[in-house]
Amino acid sequence: MGLLQDKFAKYDLPQQFMAKGVYPYFRTINSHQDTEVMMDGKKVLMFGSNAYMGLTYDKRIIDASIAATEKYGTGCAGSRFLNGTLDIHVELEKELAEFVGKDEALCFSTGFTVNEGIIPAVVGRGDYIICDDRDHASIVDGRRLAFATQLKYKHNDMEALEKELQKCEPDAVKLIVVDGVFSMEGDLANLPEIVRLKKKYNASIYVDEAHGLGVFGKQGRGVCDHFGVTEDVDLIMGTFSKSLASIGGCVVG
């Protein structure tokens, strides 16, 4: 056994929780995702699902998925840069941009990789990234990869956000990154006030709509639409694994 294996050989905390019957992870579901699911041979209520609109078991979605698989197969067999861009990708990106109310969209394999990829692509050394201290872990990873100066403010505290903006060089790029709906707290970002501060300090705004898309706004256009600030938000991220009953993510702007 090597050093890596030795490191974890005595780690038995999960087993301790399992023995007490309180280990909450990797519970196996034996049915489709619905308000009730089958688990360990029993029907139980589902309180943890992100399928906010129930589309994961909608027959129209299932039929469209089957039709697409029969036409295109189960994979793209290449990256988007080379041979992995399908006509339905281009069509989807156009429709996403139109739906949210922006010019362009770009799809990713997951919502997590949107934040990991886009944030370091748009800010870097010499720039500032200002985040709510309750932002999602994918935003945390994205900002770490960016090599920009990282500033954090107390959750939804607009006075604290303004103080962080005042620390930034006036002529530097300043990107405020915030969850539209905070996944742990369940509250909304104060986007109207964030937009006001953006304009005052010549900053830009990136909103993670993972939990807002499909739920808030006109026809589910998200928290930005809910507050009427879509035009003032520079980049909007969304994920397909929640309301949209699939897998993947996108950024629109």
Region locations from a protein language model:
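Short, small-residue-enriched loops and turns at beta-alpha junctions
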Residues: 54-55, 82-85, 137, 158-159, ...
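Active-site PLP attachment segment
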Residues: 225-253
